[in-house]
A protein has these predicted regions:
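Membrane-embedded transmembrane alpha-helical bundles that form the catalytic cores
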Residues: 1-227
Length: 227
């Protein structure tokens, strides 16, 4: 938080030094790097739940300050954006300006009732995805060891396992994302959708445009396009 507001105050005062921008980025990325290095060596040097997503959010804000997309920001709004708990562990990754607009919006009773109803529906659908469908596919995903049977039987078993595991991953992850969306809606935050029927994709690129969309969009906006 401190380095982000230090960069913001520098940009507002006209002190647009590139080294400050780079230092701010390094400061927010460093804890994640230390945590990942510790994980490799099985040492919990510096880690906590949701550190990756907090890092992505902080990087996003710093880049948008540099690009003049954010000219002013309330400290409370920024902290709320970073630690908003419903998508804390696995996303979806929201955008700070969109999130802040929702957080500061005053809903009428009827508007909030509609939002709450949609949130509850998303929670229920997400629970079915994760707890029912995900469990079913996980139960039937039984990796078959390679044996001495005919090659086509072995190949068929491996293909079946690959499909079962793919569907299990989808329903487990998409179910969590839907529940995170639903809980967010109940708090008045319209967290964006994370999956859009990826198994109906026409090619590999289309698949990744439909799978974990907020993460792929984040990399596209803040990594690939700037490079």
């Amino acid at each position: 938080c401190a380095v982000t507001f230090w960069e913001l105050s520098s940009w507002r005062s006209g002190q647009k030094a590139l080294w400050k921008y780079r230092l701010a980025l390094a400061a927010v990325i460093a804890p994640l790097v230390v945590y990942k290095i510790g994980a490799v060596f099985d040492q919990n040097l510096m880690g906590f739940l949701g550190i990756s997503y907090i890092t992505f959010k902080a990087i996003q804000v710093i880049i948008e300050i540099r690009d003049y997309l954010i000219e002013d920001m309330n400290f409370t709004d920024y902290l709320y954006f970073l630690v908003f708990f419903t998508p804390f562990t696995s996303g979806p990754i929201d955008r700070s300006r969109r999130f802040t607009e929702d957080a500061n919006r005053r809903y009428t009773a009827s508007e909030y009732a509609d939002l709450l109803a949609r949130g509850i529906m998303l929670l229920l659908v997400g629970a079915v995805y994760q707890k029912v469908l995900g469990t079913v596919f996980h139960h039937y995903f039984t990796p078959a060891p390679l044996g001495d049977g005919p090659w086509w039987q072995e190949l068929g078993a491996q293909v079946k396992d690959a499909y079962m595991y793919g569907f299990y991953l989808f329903f487990d992850f998409a179910g969590y994302s839907l529940m995170a969306m639903g809980a967010s809606y109940c708090f008045g935050i319209k967290t964006p959708r994370n999956f859009r029927v990826p198994f109906l994709a026409l090619d590999v690129r289309d698949f990744w445009d439909r799978w974990h969309m907020t993460l792929s969009g984040w990399f596209r906006e803040y990594v690939y396009i700037p490079l």
